[in-house]
């Protein structure tokens, strides 16, 4: 035990010891019922971790530590989600490069030391190499932070979503989806990010409010009448394929089945009826364009309309006019739009409408919700592309209902989060697009045969053998072909796309557990016990993982989902790097306050509850950690064999028994909290007792504890102190792992994190299981139950302290007389603790008087 207790440097000391001793190493020889397995969220490797990561990962770690102390063999791996768009963007910004797949590989390429003014184009292979190199550096920094925070993961179980095993499992799962008809290739309207030039799934959308204008356009009916249509996107007028109104809208019922002519381009389009048209929006009749939004897609599909694409994948209008625009004047008008961005094309289209007299009135300002890719900075467009899909219930009510039922089998913490899952499933508008037109990801494991003219046959994909996985079709050759046949007539071509990162991270239980590559391990850990994650990715990670497990195993991937809330800034706004209000780095917090203090703040946030970022809470946590060390030093100063091997049978004094009985209730409450995933409740009840223990019990028992160890009353104090300390250190251990390990090491063998979770019987149980801790000592001839003696003694001591404080006297000043008035039972109870109260309060004389009132102390200072 050090001469002076200190928190400085204990993280480095104990992290090293835990690693050397294999404290958290998973033992795969145990059976499934002995295992508690956790599907740890693999953080996205796209820069630095933020305080939200520290917050939520601490919650899962507290649960892992509790389960380990309860006797479970905890399977707690760590993964890195190191492929996909966020990683690519990180590499682009870090090095100042841009991937150009048309460029040849440069084996001697060295990235710029400083990002150039304009991105430097490099080959795909060079770009992927940069991605791999930078993610390794980032992952080392991530691991260092997690170790400093005290995550009790088994680092030998670490995986990365781009490593060979993960890629093989991801490709294998996709091919099995394909074999069962759950994956398919289709040409369809696709949400498209024009900056990243890739498809985007529904789960990755984000609505952002933007200021726009309604433009009133004049169409002409077949009878020559004007039909006013209001739109916020006049630049899509050349893509117009129909007008639509509600079937009950009497203003337009006479027009259904007829045609109208578009302004400027003079293209006839049908006038249709559809129940999704909104009579109270604008003029009540809308133009259907291919494609302005998802409603256009729905109308186009259900009304069997033609396609007139105008928007290119680069976000600019296509160079050639769409079908239908044929006369010279219309073609000339379109030429003025070709090649312009959507923003510029809108301004030009308004000019054309004004010039033709087809713009009625002035544009009217409006606020509108515009869809963005959650990581993008330009509005999404909808373009027709060939993409791979996985069926997710978006177009299948039966599958959707099955996934709702599956969600109801899952235990949700907190329970109300289930409604978010169900709302998402019920609102699915289409199947899941899993292909991405990017570079650093898991390749789609498919080739296509080329016919004699060199055109791909998408109906007959070439698939790899299972034993060959993982494959990269861009460099690997399919069975039966030679690489010289690549891109040659009669040869083959690779699918150029990679999978959405969620397509791989939706398989984290399978990847961590070794599905198809380590059947023994997988059988011991799957289905997993816990999925901890943030609530905002229920729609992506949680749902996708549920879907893949449902398709592959027809069961849940885990038993419980633990959802964490957001971290809020002082203005009650979510803290995030994108908002610019998350400037404090986790490592700086850990350095300033200590890991246990930061964990204390994190565990103060209940599941699913948004929590304020509060360094004040961290200061309280640090004070608590220091107090734990000081309280331990106080208890261990008593040289007594009883301290080393305490037993409840050694506890004979009523005050000591009362304290242990109260602590036994805390053990029960803390245990219930953890089993219900309410770690905050466990912390609160333990901390509340601890401060009372330090402020009241230690003061009350101090004088007696310094007595002769041969005195049974002194031995009782020593045993009670040791039992309480041993229990408190274990109760705090899941939340405050470093300080509890430090204090434990001063007087106990092994690690506190491998010690058993405290049980009530350790504190109050007799051999026959009878709880006698809160009863009058049987040597006094009574079995009458006594109310909380510790509370009674603490109340009298508090009155004595208050009297001294008001008189501005030292707490060691003597009390000439303590007079107690109260009922006979209360006075008898006080007699059992009188010795300790008198010693703690420095009381010379005590008088008692029976009265039908609550116990009332009167203090006469000396």
From Swiss-Prot:
Keywords: Aminoacyl-tRNA synthetase, ATP-binding, Cytoplasm, Ligase, Nucleotide-binding, Protein biosynthesis. It is found in: Cytoplasm. GO terms for molecular function: aminoacyl-tRNA deacylase activity; ATP binding; valine-tRNA ligase activity. Disulfide bonds: none annotated. Catalyzes the attachment of valine to tRNA(Val). As ValRS can inadvertently accommodate and process structurally similar amino acids such as threonine, to avoid such errors, it has a 'posttransfer' editing activity that hydrolyzes mischarged Thr-tRNA(Val) in a tRNA-dependent manner. Belongs to the class-I aminoacyl-tRNA synthetase family. ValS type 2 subfamily. This is Valine--tRNA ligase. It comes from Salinispora arenicola (strain CNS-205).
